[in-house]
Amino acid sequence: RECCDLSMVQAATLSARQVLGSAPTYPSEIGQDKWVLIKMFPAVDDGFFLDVGSGHGTIGSNTKALEERGWSGICVDPFPTYMDGRTCQVFKEVVSSAAGQVVKFHTHAGLGGIADSLGKWKEEAQKSPAVELTTTTLGDVLARANAPTFIHFLSLDIEGAELDALKGMDLNKYRFGAMAIEHNEEEPKRTDIINYLRQHGYERVHTYRQDDFFAPIAR
């Protein structure tokens, strides 16, 4: 089961394409990529994404399927792996609410993150080596990447530092069509993210397992 159920017509069409061998693959863990491409932007073949905590370039990737559709974007991760064949601009950096902060970062594959922000998987992550890194902000990354001010999809999965990352960019300047943000059922972080995004014009439209899904509030 995945995050977002398809309509009967969509499901039947997808099944037929799978039989014929022409169906796209969706490598994301819980269907974030399928939600974007089928539910949110089914007619968009040239969208733009921001993948923060991109990790493995293929396995579990929330944005590889988007690139295969023709999208472009930015991948941010201090230790990206298996990015051969990916087309996103890769920034090997750690992001927070402010630039220039020296932080301790645990390098655990898939669960690594800033030591002071780690939540649900903290004990597991702390078993991995730690290095010192200097933070940047998403605002700085977007500026250096010459990103468009409208970004179709934000994927944010950085093990407890999601709210700090959001605060590191101007959400009045950069607008998003859809967001999938990991919360890992951590409070008050989860509620703080929901409230912060609502203040900037977004509402939660779906939730599944460790992610909340957001879209602009309908006017």
Residue ranges of model-derived segments:
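Phosphate/nucleotide-binding beta-alpha loop and adjacent structural elements of enzyme active sites
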Residues: 1-219
